Each structure stands twice: as structure tokens, then as C-alpha cells.
């Protein structure tokens, strides 16, 4: 199992999935191929662990499993019915240590299986406890699992909860001894089947996804070079007119000045296509000054969208379309978190968050872009931009878990409800670190137009959430939402259309 898991991990490393639950579970798939008669079934459901505990493992994948101890004993005991009669049974004890991992966290599970045969008084009884079914030799085992340790993330001890869930349950199972013991070498054939039916298709899927991602980046790179060449040709006209330099610089000081400047050049920058054309020329004329103007428009658009111009639905529709502003969105949709957690929250609770206050604070007065002439910004460029601002959002609202989940929460550290104020801070800057751009699903250090006149722009974002309620705050810390850096997967760096923010400001000014 460890080898197969290593091969699954290697296949996933080609281009990691964004949702770790999509990685094939080796234990479930492997024992599914071995059949129900194989003993023991070393996965949560096969061990008869309660569904609410077994569900925890859906978010994790097996990292390692080890058999720490195996004891086989012949036990002698007095018959409880016939006085003076002695009976025997074989007892088996197996101790296992497993490590599961997923979404940046781990589970340390140590458990034992205690099994015994039916009682027998003589060899005839012993022989009668076995029966033949076709080519397979079968017997019946009585067994029970026991949990020695169940710890999540090194500190969250769930051992008592797991032990309580298991109780003193005793299970009996028809065991296929031919598959489980006699023809043990067939497990090699099962591993081959696993590779053919599960591993190979998963590997091909990740290789295809990686190839598509590489091809997408290649096309973006080609588009960027083509756009740069076209923009340079158009910018020659601007550079020849030194007298216009002052007017050009002034155009990048306010939205009204920008509109006025380009209207004299027969461009209506409230039209998205003409705005894109104007920005391409402006970037070639003075890249840093134009970038600074775009970042100022970015900040202003966020502020106006939720404050001064929040009723201007016409401008919102024209600039951002029916989906609305790309970043930051309001409510639960505006909070970054793993996909599985979002699914849990939306399916198990009623959540209501309403913006009470939103403020945008600039932290760098003169943003710049680390552009290399003739090269631009490479897709794997770290620290591509120099700017920084913060968005502070104060929410009011709360959530309430639905029926059963609210009851189940009484036995966990998950608050069944919460209401009050939530403070959400986004720290946005251009210092995208090396370890982020090295991720295989990193979208690229984008600052380029596409064929839809969108100025694709990669953000580096840190999300910080705080609430007054200590229980809810502990829950946020447990999911790392109190200080989350957007790096990879469902919480990888977002890409926005930077031009749409300036477009909104121009339409609203």
C-alpha cells in the first residue's frame, strides 16, 4: 500500500489537483479489488468506523501504513455452558500505525484489530469451522477494532471521540482464507490491477492537465509578445510628440483628465475596446506611470463599488458584466477557503454576511512594475510588481447549522451558530514570492491583454479574518483562515481584469 500510495503521489505531483479529495484513495480502491472476503479491510469503512468519523478521512489520503505487531495465540478457556468442559480458539492481534495527509494537515491514527475463531473442543470442531466454496477455503472470524490514538494536526486529539464512536462493537465476518492467506502472492496481481485500472488513468489525467496548462501559458506568452510588438508600433507616434508629454502625464492624474486627453485623440475610453487601445499606447509611453494610474483606479473602483457609487448599476454592468466585481466579492463568495470547506459550509448551514463598512488604504505612493525591455514579465517572475494596499471589510451577520449538523456540533469544537461582526482584511501587493510562482498550478505573473480586451493581472493576496467570539475564532484559526496566504489549489493567487476596474471609475466619474 505504501508503494502504491507513493506512485499515486508521484502521479499527482506531475500537476497537483486543486481538491485533494479527487486523489484516488489507495486503501478503498485496493481492498475493493481484493473483494469483501479479504481480511483485514484496512480503510475506515472496512474497519466499521462510524460514518461521522470515517467522513473525516474523505479529505485525506494515506501517506503511510505499518504493521507494528502481529500475535497469533491458541487460547484455552472453560466452556460457559457445560461445567468442566474446555474449549479452544485462535486469537489474532494486529497493531497498525497510519499517517493520513491532505490540505496541509495530517491525521495520526494508531489502531488494533483483535480477532478470534469460533470455539472448538477438538480437531473435528476445528475442521467444521472451515468450509469450501468453489476453490476458496472460508472461515468465520469475530473481531473488533480499537483506536489507540487519533490526532489531527499534531494537537487536536480525537482519540476519545473515536473510541466512544466504536464502543464495544463486535463484528463477525466470513473470511476468504484462500485470498487472505493461502494465495497471498495474488496481492501482487491485485497491485497490477490497481495500476491498470486506477493509477494509469489518474497519471494520464494529470499529464494531460499539465500539458494543457503549459500550452495555455505558451499561448499567453505568444499573445503577450504579439501585443507588445503591436503596442510599440503605435507608441512611436506618441514618443515623437514631445509637446504632448505634459498633457500625457496629466492624463494619468485623474479619471476626468484621462478621458479628456484621449477624447482629443478620438478615443472614447468609456468604451472597453477603445480603453484597451489607449492603455496599450499609454503603457508603451510610460509603463510605470500608467501602472501607478491603474493601481489607483483599482483601489478607487473597489471603494466606489461598495460605497460612493454602489447604486450605479449601469456602470457596474458595463465594467464588470453580470458576474460583478472580480475582487473582492462580498459575502461568503468573497472569502477564500478550500473547496471542501466551502462545500461543507454551504450545504450544512445558513450563512448571512452583510457589508457594514469597507475601507481601502494605500501603502505605497508610487507603484512600479519590474518590466524588462524586450522580455516583459516572464510567467515565472517572482516579485513582478511594487505596490501595496489593504482592503478592510467589516461584516455583520452570522450562520446557523442545519438540524442534525447543529446537534452533531455539540460533540465537537465547531460552534453551531454565530452572529456578530466579522473583520476581513485583504493585503494586496505585487511581491509574489518564489515559492508561489514555483507551484505547478500558478497562473503566471500576468500583466497582459487577452483577445477580450481584458488586462489580466495576477494578485498576491493575504487574507486575515477576526471575530470577537473565541469559539468561532478558534475554528477560523484551525482552518488557517485567520491568516491565509493565497498560494495554490482553491486558494491560489487570483487573476483579475485590471482594466475593468479603471473602466468602472471612468464610467462613474
Curated annotation (Swiss-Prot):
Q: What is this protein called?
A: Uncharacterized protein MPN_508
Q: Which InterPro entries match?
A: DUF237, DUF240
Give the family, as the similarity comment puts it. Belongs to the MG032/MG096/MG288 family.
Q: Which organism is it from?
A: Mycoplasma pneumoniae (strain ATCC 29342 / M129 / Subtype 1) (Mycoplasmoides pneumoniae)
Q: Which domain of life is it from?
A: Bacteria
* Pfam name, any one: DUF237
Amino acid at each position: 500500500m505504501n508503494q502504491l500510495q507513493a506512485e499515486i503521489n508521484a502521479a499527482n505531483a506531475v500537476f497537483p489537483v486543486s481538491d485533494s479529495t479527487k486523489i484516488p484513495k489507495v486503501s478503498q480502491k485496493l481492498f475493493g479489488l481484493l473483494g469483501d472476503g479479504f481480511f483485514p479491510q484496512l480503510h475506515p469503512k472496512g474497519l466499521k468506523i462510524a460514518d461521522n468519523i470515517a467522513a473525516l478521512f474523505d479529505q485525506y489520503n494515506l501517506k503511510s501504513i505499518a504493521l507494528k505487531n502481529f500475535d497469533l495465540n491458541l487460547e484455552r478457556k472453560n466452556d460457559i455452558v457445560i461445567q468442566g468442559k474446555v474449549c479452544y480458539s485462535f486469537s489474532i492481534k494486529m497493531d497498525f500505525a497510519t499517517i493520513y495527509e491532505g490540505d496541509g494537515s495530517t491525521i495520526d491514527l494508531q489502531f488494533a484489530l483483535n480477532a478470534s475463531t469460533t470455539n472448538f473442543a477438538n480437531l473435528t470442531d476445528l475442521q467444521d469451522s472451515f468450509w469450501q466454496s468453489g476453490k476458496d477455503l472460508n472461515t468465520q472470524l469475530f473481531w473488533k477494532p480499537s483506536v489507540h490514538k487519533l490526532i489531527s494536526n499534531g494537537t487536536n486529539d480525537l482519540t476519545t471521540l473515536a473510541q466512544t464512536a466504536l464502543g464495544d462493537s463486535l463484528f463477525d465476518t466470513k473470511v476468504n482464507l484462500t485470498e487472505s492467506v493461502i494465495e497471498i502472492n495474488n496481492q501482487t496481481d491485485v497491485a497490477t490491477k490497481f495500476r491498470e485500472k486506477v493509477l494509469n488513468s489518474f497519471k494520464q489525467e494529470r499529464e494531460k492537465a499539465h500539458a494543457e496548462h503549459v500550452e495555455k501559458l505558451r499561448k499567453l506568452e505568444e499573445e503577450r509578445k504579439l501585443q507588445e510588438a503591436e503596442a510599440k508600433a503605435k507608441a512611436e507616434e506618441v514618443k515623437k510628440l514631445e509637446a504632448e508629454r505634459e498633457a500625457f502625464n496629466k492624463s494619468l492624474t485623474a479619471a476626468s483628465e484621462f478621458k479628456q486627453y484621449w477624447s482629443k485623440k478620438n478615443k472614447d475610453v468609456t468604451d472597453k475596446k477603445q480603453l484597451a487601445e489607449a492603455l496599450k499606447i499609454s503603457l508603451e509611453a510610460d509603463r510605470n506611470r500608467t501602472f501607478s494610474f491603474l493601481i489607483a483606479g483599482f483601489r478607487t473602483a473597489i471603494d466606489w463599488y461598495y460605497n460612493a457609487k454602489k447604486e450605479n448599476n449601469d456602470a457596474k454592468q458595463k465594467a464588470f458584466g453580470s458576474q460583478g466585481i472580480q475582487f473582492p466579492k462580498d459575502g461568503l463568495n468573497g472569502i477564500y477557503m478550500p473547496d471542501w470547506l466551502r462545500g461543507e459550509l454551504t450545504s450544512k448551514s445558513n450563512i448571512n454576511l452583510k457589508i457594514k463598512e469597507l475601507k481601502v488604504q494605500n501603502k505605497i505612493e508610487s507603484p512600479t512594475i519590474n518590466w524588462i525591455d524586450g522580455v516583459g514579465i516572464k510567467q515565472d517572475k517572482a516579485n513582478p510588481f511594487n505596490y501595496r494596499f489593504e482592503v478592510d471589510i467589516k461584516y455583520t451577520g452570522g450562520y446557523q447549522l442545519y438540524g442534525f449538523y447543529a446537534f452533531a456540533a455539540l460533540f465537537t469544537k465547531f460552534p453551531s451558530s454565530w452572529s456578530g461582526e466579522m473583520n476581513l482584511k485583504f493585503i494586496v501587493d505585487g511581491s509574489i514570492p518564489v515559492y508561489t510562482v514555483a507551484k505547478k498550478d500558478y497562473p503566471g505573473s500576468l500583466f497582459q491583454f487577452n483577445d477580450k480586451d481584458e488586462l489580466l493581472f495576477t494578485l498576491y493576496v493575504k487574507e486575515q479574518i477576526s471575530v470577537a467570539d473565541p469559539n468561532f475564532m478558534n475554528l477560523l484559526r484551525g482552518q488557517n483562515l485567520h491568516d491565509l496566504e493565497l498560494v495554490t489549489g482553491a486558494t491560489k493567487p487570483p487573476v483579475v481584469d485590471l482594466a475593468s476596474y479603471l473602466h468602472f471609475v471612468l464610467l462613474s466619474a
